[in-house]
Amino acid sequence: MESRIWCLVVCVNLCIVCLGAAVSSSSTRGTSATHSHHSSHTTSAAHSRSGSVSQRVTSSQTVSHGVNETIYNTTLKYGDVVGVNTTKYPYRVCSMAQGTDLIRFERNIVCTSMKPINEDLDEGIMVVYKRNIVAHTFKVRVYQKVLTFRRSYAYIHTTYLLGSNTEYVAPPMWEIHHINSHSQCYSSYSRVIAGTVFVAYHRDSYENKTMQLMPDDYSNTHSTRYVTVKDQWHSRGSTWLYRETCNLNCMVTITTARSKYPYHFFATSTGDVVDISPFYNGTNRNASYFGENADKFFIFPNYTIVSDFGRPNSALETHRLVAFLERADSVISWDIQDEKNVTCQLTFWEASERTIRSEAEDSYHFSSAKMTATFLSKKQEVNMSDSALDCVRDEAINKLQQIFNTSYNQTYEKYGNVSVFETTGGLVVFWQGIKQKSLVELERLANRSSLNLTHNRTKRSTDGNNATHLSNMESVHNLVYAQLQFTYDTLRGYINRALAQIAEAWCVDQRRTLEVFKELSKINPSAILSAIYNKPIAARFMGDVLGLASCVTINQTSVKVLRDMNVKESPGRCYSRPVVIFNFANSSYVQYGQLGEDNEILLGNHRTEECQLPSLKIFIAGNSAYEYVDYLFKRMIDLSSISTVDSMIALDIDPLENTDFRVLELYSQKELRSSNVFDLEEIMREFNSYKQRVKYVEDKVVDPLPPYLKGLDDLMSGLGAAGKAVGVAIGAVGGAVASVVEGVATFLKNPFGAFTIILVAIAVVIIIYLIYTRQRRLCMQPLQNLFPYLVSADGTTVTSGNTKDTSLQAPPSYEESVYNSGRKGPGPPSSDASTAAPPYTNEQAYQMLLALVRLDAEQRAQQNGTDSLDGQTGTQDKGQKPNLLDRLRHRKNGYRHLKDSDEEENV
């Protein structure tokens, strides 16, 4: 059964092959006799392909076929053909009878000049104003009284100056008015301390009188001082007495004060700092700062002050508004003025008569070659009616007019009105546009002829959102950023002009290249037009124009490239390009052609040449290439392995865009101020605050003078000159006592003095202890202490008998002592009268006392003589007596006096 099935399959295949061969032979009749048998001469060269061909390759073998199998509808075998590559262009037939679209090459190409960036450039005049950082300067009057107290001590011929004390006090307001109207000051000053009025008089005159002000010898450019006393007075006191005198000097100083924006305080050249705005008038606290004590601040309208304090009977001047600030050490006065009349936030910096304003996307660039700087500003103008511009508006307009009259009046006209812009660095630019008269006339003619443009250029609107107010930002102190911006804009202009020239030259080169394409298209129009449009195009000349048509796309899977390029019926002849077979779409009829460039199929196979041996030909198809050696296919190679001739000059240029340089601050103004160890403003303010605190402390100080001394002083002063002299004497004694007590107290406070006192106290305690022990010993042993010669060195009592025997005897016992001589037995003592001692009479007692006195005198004289004799012979007997070391060594066993040689002989 299975054998029958296989037989049927084989028969069917044979029938199909025979039928296909019959159809093929009938369809190729009359076309070419060589088409039916030239493939029999093809070689069976090995089919090789480069491993690097990774692009899409379409082969006719959609299924696995044997090398000897015949291709459908042909007499060729699969081993006689090579696969194809359709990577870049598909296989197509571009031969046509007539084009459907007509084109021509441009002959009159015009290369216009390139404008790098669409910039609106205006020419004009620029006046630049900077922020005024100079402090506001004005005159200030300072009123003071200087009390100088000097103390001296008068010796017999010399007076010693012990020191001086200077105190600055503020005159009362009633005296200030007298000084301002008469240039005179009173010679006294009174102060209330703890409810008591203290009065100081000039030169201790005890009378209050006026003193005329006069110019001081010391003056400078910013301060003028008027005083009542130039020399300090002091008088010598009485001999051996102290003297303290008072010198009172009135001082009026006209100095300079400075205040910077926003004028919250001002500082004088004398070092005083006032936390009040110099423009505060009592009603404008919202606009002007006030930080002092309101009770000590006074404002007087239409106030009169002498024109010269140093000249008597000087003329009076009326001041509109004068402020007075009363302090503990001075009274400060100044004239109150309107801020807008005496200050200005802006000051003139520079003018540029030739300025170019370029308009960027969000900003204006004002470039001046004279200043070598470019300033950036927003497109919004500053309102011309801004109050901050009131002080410079007229000046700026006049400067612009002067520059225009000097440089442009003959050839230029003003173009628009004056505009104001604020730069990124805080500068203010007044801008006046100008334009040549000839251009203005042309614009006027164009405006008259145009129905839509019937008006000239007018001033930009400064209302609404187009205008802004001047900000309060501070000007930068370094304008390097403006010079950097100018450098960048200059380089940008040069580079953009160079790029414009390059672009224009590129256009000229493209025009010439187009002429070359035109001439080359006469040779192969389809190839030239396909290269230009980057797609397959069929082109043919129709006179002076080109007819274009789309190429006919064929069945890509049916394309086969033959391996052999030899012509069978013509020995020695070879095809100049490989032969291919293909089918049109929706047709199974096999067509023959030759492989053209870029996968184009050339109809027919008549393109032959004489065979040249040896030969090497490579035909490109997509990203691969067919290599034929001696007109036989050898292999497919990767197209990337073959170097290319690159004649393309790439040109990728972009114009430089606008860049607005920002003002960068590495450290802010606050950080720079904080980096300093000393801040003069803060120091002066702190010092001023410290001085203000002193006046509050003075009210709480209690007079340390005792009430009784004050009463005594009043009592002595009431007794006249004699009482005053007695009071001076008492004061001197009291001062001496107070000085001694103060010295003792100071000595005790000293660590060395306290230590000395401790040592003295210890010594006193030791002395008291020694005295106490002596008195105790005297009470216990009166005879031994009062009559030391009665006791020998060994502790025995010396009697009037034989001292040689008794000195060596032991002392008698207590029972055998003389105190018990009346006792006869061991029993208790008897009270018998016979044992009692006989009474002594007064005469006997008196004689006994005299005998004791004589005995004491003799014994003492004898002892003194013995001591002197021992001193003379001490050097001879020094070695026999114990020294200090022996005494210390045997101090525990006691010490007995050793007898010398004289005593031994006597024994």
Swiss-Prot record:
The record marks R460, S461 as: Cleavage. The chain crosses the membrane at residues 752-772. InterPro entries: Glycoprot_B_antigenic_N (IPR021044), Glycoprot_B_PH1 (IPR035377), Glycoprot_B_PH2 (IPR035381), Glycoprot_B_PH2_sf (IPR038631), Glycoprotein_B_ecto_C (IPR055341), Herpes_Glycoprot_B (IPR000234). One of its GO terms (biological process) is symbiont entry into host cell. Pfam families: Glycoprot_B_PH1, Glycoprot_B_PH2, Glycoprotein_B, HCMVantigenic_N. Residues 1-22 form the signal peptide. A proteolytic cleavage by host furin generates two subunits that remain linked by disulfide bonds. This is Envelope glycoprotein B. Disulfide bonds join C94-C551, C111-C507, C185-C250, C344-C391, C574-C611. Residues 697-749, 708-748 are annotated as: Hydrophobic membrane proximal region. Residues 798-810, 860-877 have a biased composition (Polar residues). Residues 152-158, 237-244 are annotated as: Involved in fusion and/or binding to host membrane. The gene is gB. Envelope glycoprotein that plays a role in host cell entry, cell to-cell virus transmission, and fusion of infected cells. May be involved in the initial attachment via binding to heparan sulfate together with the gM/gN complex that binds heparin with higher affinity. Interacts with host integrin ITGB1, PDGFRA and EGFR that likely serve as postattachment entry receptors. Also participates in the fusion of viral and cellular membranes leading to virus entry into the host cell. Membrane fusion is mediated by the fusion machinery composed at least of gB and the heterodimer gH/gL. GO terms for cellular component: host cell endosome membrane; host cell Golgi membrane; host cell plasma membrane; membrane; viral envelope; virion membrane. It comes from Human cytomegalovirus (strain Towne). Residues 41-62 have a biased composition (Low complexity). Glycans are attached at residues 68, 73, 85, 208, 281, 286, 302, 341, 383, 405, 409, 417, 447, 452, 456, 466, 555, 586. Gene3D superfamilies: 1.20.5.1890, 2.30.29.100, 2.30.30.1230, 6.10.250.3280. Residues 29-62, 798-838, 860-907 are annotated as: Disordered. Residues 878-887 have a biased composition (Basic and acidic residues).
